[in-house]
């Protein structure tokens, strides 16, 4: 756990300095690589949660739609917000990354729920550590494999944790 946290903190120190546009370009490659494995992922979903294979396409299609949408609005939504009230001073709100985001994803829609946290967090300059349900461990591994090919090292990590260790991470 400590090694993963430390490597994510170290990676975030440089990831956050890429422009939003640069991060979005890399994340689009991440999504593309992940979805290129859709047949393998569909079979794994069936084995892990017992969902009919005919329904796997819906989850992966939803993953793509959500990721594409969030990445398409990232530059606008992460831009500085001008709150200037007079001409003597320029006032603005600057959005800054938080650091490392720990995401816990459930078993029932493991990709569809994870995408809602991991893509915006990374687009904003944070690194992500994903903990999937013990019932769907291969989901985190598939995302990690795509991250290894397309993102800087340790921007996306995963941990397989039991309940006790998961609580330790979130309480620390």
Feature roles, as predicted:
Residues 1-89:
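N-terminal Rossmann-like NAD(P)+-binding subdomain of aldehyde/semialdehyde dehydrogenases
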Residues 82-172:
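Rossmann-like NAD(P) dinucleotide-binding subdomain of oxidoreductase/dehydrogenase enzymes
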